[in-house]
Amino acid sequence: MNLFDNYLTSKTSPLDLFQLLELIGIGSTCKVYKAISKKTNKIYSIKICNEIEKNYEPIINEINCFRLFKNENSYIVKFYGIYYLKNDNTIWIILEYFEYGNIISYLNKINYKPDEELLATIIQNVLFGLLYLHSKNIIHRDIKSQNLLLSSEGRIKISDFGISINKNNINPNNIVGSPYWMSPEVIIRDNYNEKTDIYSLGITIYELVEGFPPYSEFKPAIAMKKIIQNPIKSLKNENKYSKELNDFVKLCLNVDFNERPNVSQLLEHKFIKKSGSVKLLKNFIEENNCYFFNQKNSFSENNKNCENEYMELNSYCNNNIENNNNNEEEEINDSVIVHDDDNTVIVKENNSKKQILNYKEILKYDSNYSNLEFVEHESTSNLSYNTDFLNPH
């Protein structure tokens, strides 16, 4: 019996139902394809996961979230099914397809920094999604621009629920998330709540307006230390932005999570009142379609080279990981990335090679990878370095 039998949409082979068209994302344990339904000709994204025994937990976690959501909310990525391919021992997760990818890749591709009306509209969409998640007692725990996907109808949708959790099941001893966007209370293992997502949203705004998250010049573990020692409380260049935007970000980044506003309160903020009509994002997409698709076509010519470069980098990162079950290690030093379920994932220093591990160093790959949606979510029990910094979905 397959571990996933109770979760499958049907036991039909996915090869009988879908034709894979194009590779759009790569991870160490999964690949994402643009695919077409053989029956309806509808386009989907299909996440094909291998090493499924090792990755059981995050896969099931995401599936359970999607089952809870039932595609009820327009600001959450839609889920259409899960299938098992026996020949390859792979799980196929059928998801909504996003031609334009995540919001940061899209903006980078068209070389556009959002004005405050567009930014307010983007963030309002994210808040609508978070309002729904939090109403279901779900904490996302990985809010960042790479997990905010831009749909053709002009909505921002939240994706990637591999480490999401019911707020009643939180174990504060687990440090989970993407380091640059991680809230102080998660890092210090406080009894955090859904307002950790609000902090990550504040960092996401910082990323969208500044081009990168705070402390991105440092390796992830060092950045986590700095988040605690010298918390980010505002945008880097406040004088460039309105009072409303600066105030909104400061509220999100309040170090005391009990003092942070909740989603409903943020939706009433003056900055969000700057958001445009429901057609604003759709019109923005249409105005930039020509430039976007020219950039996309240019990228496609180098797709194979990009895949090889990514796999080399990912292989290097994975080869420098060591599992450590010593729960007494409390200090976040230069090596520790994340703790989860009694496992400690450690990035080992390698003096013979330069480790490309900080956000800014990784950005040099972004011109090649701008169209790839890196969607894997590494469970710390997989002994794999979390490559979220490579522009994942």
For each feature predicted by the language model, list its residue ranges.
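Protein kinase glycine-rich loop
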Residues: L21-G27, V32
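Conserved N-lobe beta3->alphaC-helix segment of eukaryotic protein kinase catalytic domains
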Residues: I43, I48-E72
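Short beta-strand micro-motifs within the conserved protein kinase catalytic domain, predominantly
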Residues: K78-D88
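Conserved short submotifs of the Hanks-type protein kinase catalytic core
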Residues: D88-N102
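Activation segment signature within eukaryotic-like protein kinase domains
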Residues: I122-I123
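Conserved catalytic-loop aspartate of Hanks-type protein kinases
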Residues: D197
